[in-house]
Each structure stands twice: as C-alpha cells, then as structure tokens.
C-alpha cells in the first residue's frame, strides 16, 4: 500500500502511529521484548491514553533474527501459517545497556536504540547492513475503509539491489517496483505472478522473509527510494532477517528454514513432450508423435497428456474420456514399453457436469460460501467448484483418485492452476480466507506430492507445478506458466526463472517454443536451445503441436543436438541438482549469485549460470546476434573450444545449433557416455574435461550416483607445470581431456591421444601426473 504522499505528507485518510521511545526492555526466555511508545512517556501524565508497541526479537535458527511488532495482541490469528523449521535451542545473546538493547544470533544482531531518536538496526559482526529509522515503521489506520495495517521500512544503501519476491517476469532487479504478493493467473507478460513469495534478498548479502501468508504489499525503492517498505493488514507484523553473507549462504539458511527443494529423479531431466492444450489428440495422435521422434532419432523421455485426457466440462474427476482413450491402461502400458514416463494434467477444481459433482457436494468436499452454499463460477469450467483441501476426507478422496492413476501406470502429475482462490468463502477447518488464497497452492501441491511419495517413493516423485507459496520448493518441478511464442516472452520467462531461483526454488522449467500462438521456426529453435539448457525441458503449447517437424527440418536437428548434449551433461547437472537439494542453490542462477563481488553482474537478466561452472546466454534474435558478459577469468566454449577473457562484454553471432555456453577456468567438468537418456550410470565411461587450470589451483569434480550422493571424486592440482590428478571412489574407463592443450612434456601412469578439443589422457588406474 501507498502510505506516504511525497516526502512530507501521508496519503489522505491515513493515521500513522510509530514506535518512538523505548519504555522498557525485558528478557523472556530466549526472546528480547521491547516496549516502545509513540511519544515521550517519561512523565506519568504521558503514560495515559497512548498505544504501546511490543517488539519481540527471537531466533528460529542460527543467523536468523525474527522481529514481531505487535499492536493489539487479542486479534484473531487463524491459520494457515507457513510451515517453518523453528528450532528451540538456538544460542542467542541479549545485551541491555543504557544506550541500546541488542539481540544476537550467529553473526547477526538487531539493535534498538534508546533515548530521543528511535532506530532499529541490523548488524553483521557489528557493521550495519540495514534497519529502520524514526517514523519508518508502525501502525496505519485507514479511515477510508476502516482497516488497519502494520508496516516496516528497511533501508537500502547506495548501489544496493533487491531480488526475489517469487517468480516475477518484470525486471530482475526489484528496485523501483511495487509488488503485491497475491497469486494470480496472469501469464508471463504482466506484473502478476503465479508464485508470490514474500522473501527478498539484496546484493549486500542478507534476505528478509515477511511471515504472513496473506497479501503483503512491497514498495521496493519506489514509494521511498532508499527503502524497502512492506505492509500487511494485521495487528502485528512479523519478519525475519536472514544473514548470508553471500547470496548462496542466504538461500542456504532460507531453505533450511522453509524447506529444501527435493531431488527430482534423473529421468525428469530428459525431454518432455505434450499433447498441447486444446489440440485434437487420441492414442493414434500420441503414437504418431512418439514414433516420429524415434524415426528422427530424437531422444524422448516423458510424454504428457494435457487436459483433454478427461471429458470436456468435467475437469477434474480423473476419468479418462472413453471416446478418445478407450483403453487407457493398455495405452499407458504400450507407451511405457517404449521407455517413456507418463505425466497427466490435473487441477484442484471440478466442473458441475461431472457425474461425481453431486457426491462431492453432498459429502462437503467442495469449498463453500459463508452462507453454506457452494462457491461456484463459470470461468474455466461451467459451474466450477474448488476442492476444499482443508477437509481431510476431501484430501483422501482426491488422493485415492490419483493413486488409481498411479496404479494404472502414471508416473507424475502436472499440478496446474491453484491461483484464483476466492476469499468470500468458509473453509472446512476455519482457515482465514485471506491467508488461504496463496497458501492453497502449498497444500494442493503437498497433497499430490505425498501421493507420489506414498506410491512410487520420494526418490521417484516429481510434479510439474505452476502455483506456489512459501515452502512449495519442497515439491519440484515448477514451470513458468503461459508465455507467448516470441523472443520477448522467452526473455521474460528467463527473468521469471532467475527470480524464482532467488526465492528458494531449485528447479524450474518453461514452455519451450511459447504457449500462446505458434512461434516462427527461428523462435522455436532458439527457445529449444535455451530450454534444453534449463534444469527441466518440456515442449508444450496451446492450440498447436510442438513436435519439431511441425516447424522445419532444422528444428529436428536442433532438438536432437541439445537433447543429446543435455543427456551427456547429466553427471554435471545431477550433481548440481544434488547441491540444490542439499543447500538450496538453484540449478539455474542469476549471475550475481555466483559472482556477488562483481558489480557488473548485478543487473544481468539475459544470461545465467547453469550450476557452478557453466555460463549460458540464450540468443533472442533471428540473426543470432547476442551480447553477454563474462566475469573475471579465462572462459572456454563447451563445444566450440574458443577461449575468451573475462571482466568484459562480448558480441557474437550464432547459428541455430549454437549459443554462448562458456565454462569458467579451473573447472573439471564431467560428461557422460550416453546421449540418449538422462538416467544411466554416470561413473562409467565418464569423460572429464579440464579447463584452464591455473598454477596453484585445484579443480574438483564429484560424480553422482542415482540418489545424488557422490560415488567418484576426481581432483586435479597444478603446481608450476605439473598437474597431479587423483581419483577416489568407484569409476570405470574414465578419461581426461586437457582442453586446448595439444601436447605435454610428460605423462605418468596413462596414455594419450589427440582430439579436436585437446589432448585426451586415459589413466592406468585412478592417478595421473602430467607435465605441461
């Protein structure tokens, strides 16, 4: 909400009350409690007829400081609440002096100044990183609508940039933006978002989570240009400041607090193909796609059935349309015999025409209005109603339907929708409708995830989800939603992917080729390269098919090349996936996350790091012109082998079988021996590639097993002109390519052979000594 009117005034109809003077400080168990008055209350006369704010400082985990500013403590506080991992035994330090009261957890502390001028400062090792000054937090009474709000304004320093707040398609840097965290089905080309997360981080190495599931209004360097303002309709405001000091460390703490991204199964990293949305399809159509892919030597790993696997006007009752798919169980069995995994579309709604609608209504499984009638409308499906997942019996009914599909052979679900959840309703468990609007996405996806966890096992569970709330990163994968089939939408999709990665989500995808309309062949081919260098890759559209031969012959070449490349990259990619699971670092990440000390990376949103070591710059032009920035170091193209210096911008032109994909120096990269499948034994026949190992440096490569654990580790250390290579663990028939090295002066315990990319060394055991 807008509170101020310029620098001197406030918006008409608003009354503001601020904490201005510390009255008393108490220690209550592990909390520091500060009582603050909105005026000087040193004289007893002024202690009457005045509000008194209660500020609670606490720590749910080391390096995280919680702040709760309370006005009236007797207000209702119905759930839902975010499922946070709150620890009870966090070591904290509380100091209460004449000048200030300070609460410390880890290296992070919150300090409240006493005396004439109010200030709340957050410090890392004694150095201020942010905070709020006098009259920059407090209580808002809106006489226009008789509503009350709490707000906070945290300072932004010179050059400080803000990121996150969910999957947003606007500029990557949030400075200057107004953000309302209210899930909406708005596509990728608007300010609306499917996945609103009231968490942001800055390039100063800290994050802030506002602990309110309802709509939180952010003014990010907009209303007050040097502050992040956030407000919520409530009698209290609770937020957490999360220490880094690096962006990766912030996400490590944040996902430890809100939940780690689960590790998707290896097969999910392959190529997904769908029926598209409103196209006509039956088993013959599906077979023509799958056989066409095989005939053209196009690797395919997952086939997805979109909405019309069910009868029209009945979504979702989980019954196959018998006219289109008379033998679904047999069809699925035949498809799986071809080595495919099967995904089907679902959503959390039910059309009135469905034969089960009356049963669901009578049993109380659908969301009701306060007067007891069903909440219904005619958008999406006629007479549409919403499953009430706060009713355990409704959850069981829904889950049993999904389990029946799994028993039929379905491997995973596309959990679509879940954004347009109304507020003029009465939930079964009495949940606050304002809070449930966003949180519904969490309980919906959690329900479906648990079905897969209980049936196929957590190690095989994967979703393709569109809506999300805080904590939903535990249920991957998430995709960007409805985008147009043009370069602008391709770029805005990338911004959304980087943004959600900066919000704690480890795995992300997008509709390759665009969803709305049909892309020209050149857009499709550029998007395929980008899509197959994303964590997850799906060909999907609305009114037209997305098989590559529907565009042109070269599209088949592009899909083949990049699918095979991704399959070969799986030893590297899956180890990065395991790191996302372990620490919350997204596989696709903004450049500023990997290079936080390079200010040139702060605003980059048309390129990204794919894991720790590989920079990808998608091409957004038909002609192939692309500009990209490389940070400090010497970078080598993954397959062209050309080398570029970092700390500068580069301009290039690429054909459709190419784009800038550069590996940073001092990297040991593992490529697999299979270009047809993502799920194979990665530690057999592994081709390690060593890129520009500098004197005094060591490169380490960890090869994962199917569960993400490390099964083999290769290290290369350089001293002068000598490179010592040692391996530990289980590996067979591995080789080492010294990129852009054509000959060596000496080699111990191995043999060598020339290749276009560099000298290839084959060890006799698990150790090598190379003299350059």
UniProtKB/Swiss-Prot annotation:
Transmembrane segments: none annotated. The active site is at residues 416, 419, 482. Optimum pH is 7.0. Its EC number is 3.2.1.177. The keyword rRNA processing does not apply. CDD domains: GH31_N, GH31_xylosidase_YicI. GO terms for molecular function: alpha-D-xyloside xylohydrolase; carbohydrate binding; identical protein binding; xyloglucan 1,6-alpha-xylosidase activity. InterPro entries: Alpha-glycosidase_related (IPR050985), Gal_mutarotase_sf_dom (IPR011013), Glyco_hydro_31_C (IPR048395), Glyco_hydro_31_N_dom (IPR025887), Glyco_hydro_31_TIM (IPR000322), Glyco_hydro_b (IPR013780), Glycoside_hydrolase_SF (IPR017853). It catalyses: Hydrolysis of terminal, non-reducing alpha-D-xylose residues with release of alpha-D-xylose. Keywords: Glycosidase, Hydrolase. One of its GO terms (biological process) is carbohydrate metabolic process. Belongs to the glycosyl hydrolase 31 family. Can catalyze the transfer of alpha-xylosyl residue from alpha-xyloside to xylose, glucose, mannose, fructose, maltose, isomaltose, nigerose, kojibiose, sucrose and trehalose. NCBIfam families: PRK10658.1. Homohexamer. This is Alpha-xylosidase. The lineage of its organism: Bacteria, Pseudomonadati, Pseudomonadota, Gammaproteobacteria, Enterobacterales. The gene is yicI.
């Amino acid at each position: 909400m807008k509170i101020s009117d310029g620098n001197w005034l406030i918006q008409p109809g608003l009354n503001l009350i601020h904490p201005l003077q510390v009255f008393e400080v108490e220690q209550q168990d592990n909390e520091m409690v500060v009582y603050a008055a909105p005026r000087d209350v040193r004289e007893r006369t002024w202690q009457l007829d005045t509000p008194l704010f209660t500020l609670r400082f606490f720590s749910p985990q080391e390096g995280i400081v919680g702040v709760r500013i309370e006005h009236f403590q007797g207000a209702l506080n119905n759930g839902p609440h975010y499922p946070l991992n709150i620890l009870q035994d966090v070591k904290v330090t509380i100091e209460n002096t004449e000048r200030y009261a300070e609460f410390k957890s880890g290296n992070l502390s919150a300090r409240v100044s006493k005396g004439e001028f109010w200030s709340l400062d957050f410090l890392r090792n004694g150095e201020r990183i942010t905070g709020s000054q006098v009259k920059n937090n407090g209580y808002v009474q809106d006489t226009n609508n008789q509503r009350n709000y709490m707000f906070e304004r945290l300072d932004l320093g010179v050059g400080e940039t803000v990121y996150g707040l969910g999957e947003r398609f606007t500029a990557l840097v949030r400075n200057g933006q107004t953000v309302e965290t209210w899930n909406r089905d708005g596509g990728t080309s608007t300010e609306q978002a499917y996945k609103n997360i009231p968490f942001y981080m800055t390039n100063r190495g800290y994050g802030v989570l506002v602990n309110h599931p309802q709509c939180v209004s952010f003014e990010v360097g907009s209303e007050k240009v040097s502050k992040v303002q956030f407000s919520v309709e409530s009698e209290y405001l609770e937020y957490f400041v999360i220490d880094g000091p690096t962006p990766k460390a912030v996400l490590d703490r944040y996902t430890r607090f809100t939940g780690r991204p689960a590790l998707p199964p290896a097969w999910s990293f392959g190529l997904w193909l769908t029926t598209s949305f409103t196209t006509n399809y039956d088993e013959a159509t599906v077979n023509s796609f799958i056989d066409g892919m095989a005939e053209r030597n196009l690797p395919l790993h997952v086939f997805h059935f979109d909405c019309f696997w069910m009868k029209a006007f009945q979504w979702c009752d989980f019954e196959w349309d018998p006219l289109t798919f008379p033998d679904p169980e047999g069809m699925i069995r035949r498809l799986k015999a071809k080595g495919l995994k099967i995904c089907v579309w679902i959503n959390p709604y039910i059309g009135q025409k469905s034969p089960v609608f009356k049963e669901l209504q009578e049993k109380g499984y659908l969301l009701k209005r306060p007067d007891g009638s069903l909440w219904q409308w005619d958008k999406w499906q006629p007479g549409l109603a919403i499953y009430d997942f706060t009713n355990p019996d409704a959850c069981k009914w829904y889950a049993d339907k999904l389990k029946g599909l799994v028993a039929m052979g379905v491997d995973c679900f596309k959990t679509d929708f879940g954004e347009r959840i109304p507020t003029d309703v009465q939930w079964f468990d009495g949940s606050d409708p304002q809070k449930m609007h966003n949180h519904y996405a969490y309980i919906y996806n959690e329900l479906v995830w648990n079905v897969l966890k209980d049936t196929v096992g957590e190690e095989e569970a994967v979703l393709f989800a569109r809506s999300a709330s805080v904590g939903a990163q535990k249920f991957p994968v998430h995709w960007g939603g409805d985008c147009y089939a043009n370069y602008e939408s391709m770029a805005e999709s990338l911004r959304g992917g980087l943004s959600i990665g900066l919000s704690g989500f480890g795995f992300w995808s997008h509709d390759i080729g665009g969803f709305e309309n049909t892309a020209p062949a050149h857009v499709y081919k550029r998007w395929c390269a980008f899509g197959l260098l994303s964590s997850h890759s799906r060909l999907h559209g609305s009114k037209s098919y997305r098989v590559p031969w529907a565009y042109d012959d070269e599209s088949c070449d592009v899909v083949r090349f990049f699918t095979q490349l991704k399959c070969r990259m799986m030893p590297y990619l899956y180890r990065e996936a395991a790191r996302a699971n372990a620490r919350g670092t997204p596989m696709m990440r903004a450049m500023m996350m990997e290079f936080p000390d390079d200010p040139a990376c702060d605003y980059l949103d048309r390129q990204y790091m794919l894991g720790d070591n590989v920079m990808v710059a998608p091409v957004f032009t038909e002609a192939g012109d692309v500009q990209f920035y490389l940070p400090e170091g010497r970078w080598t193209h993954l397959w062209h082998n050309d080398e570029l210096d970092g700390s500068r911008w580069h301009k290039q032109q690429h054909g459709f079988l190419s784009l800038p994909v550069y590996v940073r120096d001092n990297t040991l990269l593992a490529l697999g021996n299979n270009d047809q499948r993502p799920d194979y034994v990665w530690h057999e026949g592994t081709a390690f590639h060593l890129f520009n190992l500098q004197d005094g440096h060591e490169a380490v490569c960890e090869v994962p097993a199917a569960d993400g654990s490390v099964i083999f580790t290769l290290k290369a250390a350089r001293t002068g002109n000598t490179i010592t290579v040692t391996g530990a663990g289980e590996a067979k028939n591995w080789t080492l390519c010294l990129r852009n090295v054509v000959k060596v002066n000496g080699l111990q315990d191995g043999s060598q052979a020339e290749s276009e990319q560099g000298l290839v060394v084959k060890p006799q055991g698990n150790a090598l000594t190379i003299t350059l």
